[in-house]
């Protein structure tokens, strides 16, 4: 059974963190919790209690509800690069290929999302540079969703006219 959880759901002994040198990576602006959780999962056994033991308070002016900027997507993409590297380096189990596939898809998804937002922002010069440096990954990416595959193909096409048309259509769609 799949279980969704986040850092606020974990009870962790301080001794475990110190013995295994598990701390948040302060260089990551986003995704530091994911990086920490993945390293924690690799390092030790975990047990789940299938009950809600907390109450989530929704605050209207919370940062979690704020609009995402292009910088947010860039940091998120960078964080997933780092997570992929650290997990693949630390993991010693027998499911390395499966984990590689999942993390590669996740990394490609976040990178494609960042590039797509650069396209929608209209910074075609930056987009062209980023697509050039990620060309192979965009062409080979195995994203699960049709929309994400289509976006990766559009980005990998390096077709300036197509990029401008996509931006124009999306701007009109967002004005409705």
Task: Write out the residue ranges for each language-model feature.
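Hydrophobic alpha-helical core bundles mediating ligand binding, dimerization, or RNAP-core interactions
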Residues: 34-37, 80, 84, 107-111
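Conserved nucleotide-sugar donor-binding catalytic segment
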Residues: 1-70
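Short, surface-exposed acidic
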Residues: 92-102, 139-146
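Membrane-interface aromatic/basic loop that binds lipid-linked glycans or pyrophosphate carriers
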Residues: 115-176
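Alpha-helix N-cap/helix-start motif at coil-to-helix transitions, marked by capping-box chemistry
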Residues: 6, 74-78, 105
């Amino acid at each position: 059974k799949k279980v969704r959880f986040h850092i606020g759901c974990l009870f962790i002994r301080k001794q475990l963190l110190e013995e295994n040198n598990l701390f948040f990576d302060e260089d990551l602006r986003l995704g530091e919790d994911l990086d920490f959780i993945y390293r924690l999962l690799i390092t030790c056994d975990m047990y789940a209690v299938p009950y809600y033991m907390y109450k989530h308070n929704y605050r209207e002016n919370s940062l979690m509800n704020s609009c995402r900027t292009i910088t947010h997507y860039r940091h998120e993409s960078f964080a997933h690069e780092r997570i992929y590297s650290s997990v693949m380096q630390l993991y010693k189990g027998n499911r390395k290929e499966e984990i590689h596939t999942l993390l590669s898809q996740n990394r490609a998804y976040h990178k494609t999302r960042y590039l797509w937002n650069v396209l929608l922002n209209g910074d075609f010069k930056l987009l062209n540079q980023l697509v050039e440096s990620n060309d192979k990954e965009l062409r080979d990416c195995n994203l699960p969703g049709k929309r994400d595959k289509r976006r990766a193909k559009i980005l990998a096409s390096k077709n300036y006219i197509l990029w401008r048309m996509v931006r124009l259509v999306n701007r009109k769609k967002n004005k409705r």
